[in-house]
Amino acid sequence: MPDYQKEIERIGEFLRKIIADRKAVIGISGGIDSSVTLGILSKFFLHENIKAVFMPDATTPKSDYDDVDVLASTFGVKYSTVNIQNIVDTFSKTLSAVDKGAIGNIKSRIRMIVLYYFANIYNGIVVGTTNRTELLLGYYTKYGDGGCDVEPIEHLYKRDIYEIARLLGVPESIIKKKPTAGLWQGQTDEDEIGMPYSKIDDILSSIFDKGELREDPDFKKILDLHSKSDHKRRLPYSLSPD
């Protein structure tokens, strides 16, 4: 088993080097990834140097509000709440947007804009919360939750995040809840992807860590998701100077 306590220390020192004397700006949702990232920040930075922002919308369940409250209290960090629904409504009305997926991506990009607003006024660094599972699947919004200055947990699979969450003392209600990107009502990651994270991590590790390929429908599905999301992991295409 990996030494997760040592990994927490490694991530913390990495963040200290990157953020230095600036403010860490992080979006929190009551989900496992942002909770773990906030927990690590709270161990390595003065709490007044952490700007945590909760950005609910009309589809955000009350349980997320409660979990964010308990999370902030657990780690002794104050947070701001910015309800983005009015902004979402303005975009949707202006664009006559009705596609659920497109509106979900609008929400994610609005949250990115809000975080960079706070980074702007506080001379801060936006801290991302994408994990390795999401990165390899492309399960994040380009220039949305994928838009940040540093990704401290991007090398960790979802299963690693849960182990670190327990070490940090992340509230049990957050550890037990079904992961969701919060893009529409009732959405869960595993339902949308079509398989549990435990299986996804096993397949991703087999492919990308061990170089194993199998004639298996689930392997094919994961490889297809990885291939179709390749553009998310690349810088924009450009020409080289003559």
Swiss-Prot record:
Pathway note: Cofactor biosynthesis; NAD(+) biosynthesis; NAD(+) from deamido-NAD(+) (ammonia route): step 1/1
Catalytically driven reaction(s): deamido-NAD(+) + NH4(+) + ATP = AMP + diphosphate + NAD(+) + H(+)
Pfam families the UniProt entry points to: NAD_synthase
GO function term, MF aspect, one: ATP binding
Binding site for deamido-NAD(+): 109, 142, 149, 231-232
Keywords assigned: ATP-binding, Ligase, Magnesium, Metal-binding, NAD, Nucleotide-binding
Gene: nadE
Keyword Nucleotide-binding: yes
One of the GO biological process terms: NAD biosynthetic process
Similarity comment: family membership: Belongs to the NAD synthetase family.
Enzyme class, first EC level, given as a word: ligase
List of residues binding Mg(2+): 33, 134
EC number: 6.3.1.5
Protein name, as recorded: NH(3)-dependent NAD(+) synthetase
Keyword Magnesium belongs to the record: yes
Oligomeric form and interacting partners: Homodimer.
